[in-house]
Structure formats: structure tokens, C-alpha cells
């Protein structure tokens, strides 16, 4: 009986996809709004995985802690910040459309 239980447990562990929260999901869940809707945070992370690099995800996640930082990036004259902001806007628009369903 114990062997069957161990085999069943191993099968579940080995075949289940890894449930690793990304930086956007983690920041969202820790935020005031995210604590009430973990499913939405997961959806937003899925969009981030498709539209942002891991580095961009970490940068975007920091906006949950410090929203003013987003404004600083948006208003920046730096080419790198402007390029990031274009990618971030694409991510936000896509997440809004995809996760609103």
C-alpha cells in the first residue's frame, strides 16, 4: 500500500507542470488588489511571459511597490526607458484584453 502511494505521489509530482510564480504574479499577489484575485494575477503573469523578457518583468513588477517609478520611466528621455515603456504598454494592453474575459 505504501509503495502504491509513493508511486502515485511520484507520478503526480513528475507529470505536473511546475507552478512557479513569476515576478509579475508575485508582485501582484502581494499588492492590495492582487490579494483578492490570485487568478487575475496568474493571468497577467501568463501575458507577461509571452510579451516581456524576464528582465522587463522584474522591472515592471517593481511598479507594484512603487507606482511613481512607472511615471518616472514613462516621462524619461532615455532611449532605453522609451523602448521599455513601449514594450510595457504592449504588455498592459494585451493583459487588459486577455485577462478581462
Language-model segment annotations:
Residues 11-18, 26-31, 84-88:
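Short, intrinsically disordered, charge-biased short linear motifs at domain edges
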Residues 50-101:
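Compact alpha-helical subdomains of small soluble proteins
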Residues 1-21:
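Classic N-terminal secretory signal peptides
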Residues 22-69:
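Short N-proximal segments of mature Sec-exported proteins
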Amino acid at each position: 500500500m505504501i509503495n502504491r502511494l509513493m508511486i502515485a505521489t511520484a507520478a503526480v509530482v513528475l507529470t505536473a507542470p511546475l507552478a512557479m510564480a513569476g515576478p509579475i504574479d508575485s508582485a501582484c499577489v502581494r499588492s492590495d488588489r492582487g490579494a483578492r484575485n490570485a487568478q487575475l494575477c496568474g493571468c497577467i503573469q501568463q501575458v507577461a511571459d509571452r510579451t516581456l523578457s524576464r528582465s522587463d518583468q522584474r522591472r515592471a513588477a517593481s511598479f507594484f511597490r512603487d507606482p511613481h517609478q512607472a511615471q518616472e520611466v514613462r516621462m524619461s528621455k532615455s532611449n532605453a526607458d522609451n523602448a521599455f515603456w513601449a514594450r510595457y504598454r504592449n504588455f498592459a494592453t494585451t493583459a487588459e484584453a486577455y485577462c478581462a474575459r
